[in-house]
């Protein structure tokens, strides 16, 4: 087995779910591996049910994992740390559930993941904090126009993605 081209599929051998990876993404960071080996791995991933196979650099992988996975966990944990959280029942519905869902984490594991990917995660945190600060400042200044522009900017980004 050539360790430069072999990558694990997580806990697939521990799980009994037939469609565990159905339509999930499989990310390959070739790191100089031969193209034919990369294609074999990509085809294997597709055959076992992965919906998307993404070939990328380690740097882009780390940036995108910071944004798509780690940042939402930071956001969710920060959100539920509000003193309002214990009293949310009767007031909350889908928005609370959507934002807070990923706060239910293994804190030791995620601490390790955050620290291993700290630079890209810090960059994403800085961007999020900047965006939140802009919205906060517009609310504080009672600047309806700026606030609406910021909210519309987020809406346009999400809509352009077709989501």
What do these predicted ranges mean?
Residues 2-13:
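Single conserved hydrophobic/aromatic residue that forms the stacking wall/gate
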Residues 87-154:
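Interdomain hinge/lid region at the active-site interface
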Residues 20-101:
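Internal alpha-helical scaffold of NAD(P)-dependent oxidoreductase catalytic cores
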